[in-house]
Amino acid sequence: NRMPKLNVEQNVNKNAIFPEEKAESVFFKRKFIKTAIKKIEAMENKGIFISRQDALLDGIRINASNILWTGGVETWKKLAAKGYWINGTSDSLGKNNEPPCTLFDDLDWLNFTHDRNQEKSSMEKFISYELTPKEDEIKIKDKQYFYWMSGSAFQYALELYPNIIEANHACGLGASYDIIDRQISGKVVPFLNYEDWKHQITADTDE
């Protein structure tokens, strides 16, 4: 399958893109589920897959028999800064490039995720945090170019404004791409990151 390319008109007005700044893209409050701590600390011989740092609170004692694997390098860095030893990463290549389960076939793999995750996965889900929509108004209905930081943000925005499905959509090379591409197959364009997308889409405009 050939990757779709971004259909960029020259001189895209910054008022037509979302988000203009990264902070605008946060639609949810993320809250760790405290009752998960004892369950996590009791885990042994598990492969733990984490795609967001929110899935693991600071200071949880992870048994040494477990393997910790992240969805990307950024999550690795953030969890390492919290003091966790990370065994490897899928380097933002998404769930299609899941942890190398065949290398650790004696482990049961768990995907630490949030309560709104409806995605099918070869891994069992372990719900470790909740997503609560923020009360701020999301001003996106007149936007034409979108970069999505997460699949759940795209799905939530689509519920609020179904017409945005006709716009130009982009996201990173991770699980978000898999989720969004399933909904608008062949119409979402992957980028290395938000900055890469913003640079390309506004390259011909006056700063």
Predicted regions and their residues:
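Signature of uroporphyrinogen-III synthase
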Residues: 1-207
